[in-house]
From Swiss-Prot:
Disordered: region residues: 1-76
Source organism: Thermus thermophilus (strain ATCC BAA-163 / DSM 7039 / HB27)
Location of region: Sigma-70 factor domain-2: 187-257
UniProt DNA-binding region: 383-402
Keyword Cytoplasm attributed: yes
Domain description: Contains 4 domains, connected by flexible linkers. In the active conformation, the domains are in an extended conformation, each making extensive interactions with the RNA polymerase catalytic core.
One GO cellular component term: cytoplasm
Biased composition annotated in UniProt, kind: Acidic residues: 21-70
Renumbered residue ranges of the record's region Sigma-70 factor domain-3: 266-344
Intracellular or extracellular location(s): Cytoplasm
Listed name of the protein: RNA polymerase sigma factor SigA
Length: 423
C-alpha cells in the first residue's frame, strides 16, 4: 500500500512539473515561424521527406515586427528547466542581415575545418568536435537539451594543443573555424525559442514536453548546417520544417509502446485521411471496400483491415476500470481456451454415457477401445502401441477391438443415448 501511494505521489509530482514547464513556455515571447505549412501542422499527416518549398530569392520573411515583447517572469534558479526557458527568452532575435552574416561564417568555418584536416591528417569531425567543445565551454546556455556534445577532456586538450602548434600561416584556419563554430552556436541559441513554440503544438502525443524540445533542437541543428543563406530567406522559415520533421519522426519512433516503422506510419496516416474524407462525403462510416477503392491500386478490404489493426494502441491489462478503480481491464478478458459451461457440462454427460456403454465389455476390451479412440489422453493410439501396452501382437489387438465393437452394436439400447450427442 505504501509503495502504491509513493508511486502515485511520484506520478502526480511529475505531472505537475510537466504542467509548470508548459506554463513557463507559454509565457515566452512567440517566435515568428515564417510561413505555416498546413500539411506539417496536422498531427495525422504523414512524414514526408520532400524538399522544402523555399521562397524565391529576395523573399525573406521579416516577421520580427509582429512579435510582442512579453515580460518574462522572475523564476528561481533552482529549477534548471525553468532557468533554461528563462535564458533562451533573453537571447535577442536576429535580423535577416545578421542571419546571413552568421551563416556565412558557419560556411567559412566548415571550409576551414576541411583545410585543417588536410594539413594535420586528423578527422574533420574530430576537429569540429574539439573546436565546438571549446566554444561550448563558454556558452551562455550551457545546459541546452540536445546540444551539449560530449568528448573526453584529455583528448580535447591534446588535439587543441596540436592545432595551436600549427605554423602561423595555417593558424588563420583555426581562427576561422572557431569563428564559424561560435557563429553556429549563436544562430542556434537565437532560435531556441522557435523550437519551444513549435514543441508546444505537439504535446499530448506520447512524448513529454522536454523530449519534444530536445528532438526539436536536433532538427534546429540540422537546419543550421543545411541553411542556404545566399538565397536570402528568413532562417525561421527554413528551420521550421526541420524542427517539425525531427519532432514528428521522434513521435513516430518513440511515442508508441510497440514501435511502428515510419513508412507504415505514413501509410496509416494516409489511410486515416482517406477514411475521414469519405466519412464527410458519405455522411456515414465508410466500409473497408470503399476505403480500399479510394486508396487506389494495390488496396483491398483485407489490407485496409490489417492496416487499421496495426494502428491500434495497446492497452495495459492493469488499467483500472470503473469509478472505484477496484478492478482491472484484464479481469474482463475471457480465456478463449477455457471451455464454456455448456461445453463442460456436455463433455461430463458424454463421459458418463460412455462409461455406461463400456460397462458391458470386459476390462481389457474397454481399455483397448479407449486407447484406440483416444478417450484417455485425447490421442488415438495405433495397433502396435496398444499391442505393446498389453504385451500382445497388433493382430490380437485388432481382434479384441472388433469383438468389442460388435458387443456395443448388439447392446443398441446402450449406444442410442450416445447418438444424441452427435446431433
Amino acid at each position: 500500500m505504501k509503495k502504491s501511494k509513493r508511486k502515485n505521489a511520484q506520478a502526480q509530482e511529475a505531472q505537475e512539473t510537466e504542467v509548470l514547464v508548459q506554463e513557463e513556455a507559454e509565457e515566452l515571447p512567440e517566435f515568428p515561424e515564417g510561413e505555416p505549412d498546413p500539411d506539417l501542422e496536422d498531427p495525422d499527416l504523414a512524414l514526408e521527406d520532400d524538399l522544402l518549398d523555399l521562397p524565391e530569392e529576395g523573399e525573406g520573411l521579416d516577421l520580427e515586427e509582429e512579435e510582442e515583447d512579453l515580460p518574462i517572469p522572475k523564476i528561481s534558479t533552482s529549477d534548471p528547466v525553468r532557468q533554461y526557458l528563462h535564458e533562451i527568452g533573453q537571447v535577442p532575435l536576429l535580423t535577416l542581415e545578421e542571419e546571413v552574416e552568421l551563416a556565412r561564417k558557419v560556411e567559412e568555418g566548415m571550409e576551414a575545418i576541411k583545410k585543417l584536416s588536410e594539413i594535420t591528417g586528423l578527422d574533420p569531425d574530430l576537429i569540429r568536435e574539439v573546436v565546438r567543445a571549446k566554444i561550448l565551454g563558454s556558452a551562455r546556455v550551457r545546459h541546452i537539451p540536445g546540444l551539449k556534445e560530449t568528448l573526453d577532456p584529455k583528448t580535447v586538450e591534446e588535439i587543441d594543443q596540436k592545432l595551436k602548434s600549427l605554423p602561423k600561416e595555417h593558424k588563420r584556419y583555426l581562427h576561422i573555424a572557431r569563428e564559424g563554430e561560435a557563429a553556429r552556436q549563436h544562430l542556434i541559441e537565437a532560435n531556441l525559442r522557435l523550437v519551444v513554440s513549435i514543441a508546444k503544438k505537439y504535446t499530448g502525443r506520447g512524448l513529454s514536453f522536454l523530449d519534444l524540445i530536445q528532438e526539436g533542437n536536433q532538427g534546429l541543428i540540422r537546419a543550421v548546417e543545411k541553411f542556404e543563406y545566399k538565397r536570402r530567406f528568413k532562417f525561421s522559415t527554413y528551420a521550421t520544417w526541420w524542427i517539425r520533421q525531427a519532432i514528428n519522426r521522434a513521435i513516430a519512433d518513440q511515442a508508441r509502446t510497440i514501435r511502428i516503422p515510419v513508412h507504415m506510419v505514413e501509410t496509416i496516416n494516409k489511410l486515416s485521411r482517406t477514411a475521414r474524407q469519405l466519412q464527410q462525403e458519405l455522411g456515414r462510416e465508410p466500409t473497408y471496400e470503399e476505403i480500399a477503392e479510394a486508396m487506389g491500386p494495390g488496396w483491398d478490404a483485407k489490407r485496409v483491415e490489417e492496416t487499421l489493426k496495426i494502428a491500434q494502441e495497446p492497452v495495459s491489462l492493469e488499467t483500472p476500470i470503473g469509478d472505484e478503480k477496484d478492478s482491472f481491464y484484464g479481469d474482463f478478458i475471457p480465456d478463449e481456451h477455457l471451455p464454456s459451461p455448456v461445453d463442460a457440462a456436455t463433455q461430463s454427460l458424454l463421459s458418463e454415457e460412455l462409461e455406461k456403454a463400456l460397462s458391458k465389455l470386459s476390462e481389457r476390451e474397454a481399455m483397448v477401445l479407449k486407447l484406440r479412440k483416444g478417450l484417455i489422453d485425447g490421442r488415438e493410439h495405433t495397433l502396435e502401441e496398444v499391442g505393446a501396452f498389453f504385451g500382445v501382437t497388433r493382430e490380437r489387438i485388432r481382434q479384441i477391438e472388433n469383438k468389442a465393437l460388435r458387443k456395443l452394436k448388439y447392446h443398441e439400447s446402450r449406444t442410442r443415448k450416445l447418438r444424441d450427442f452427435l446431433d
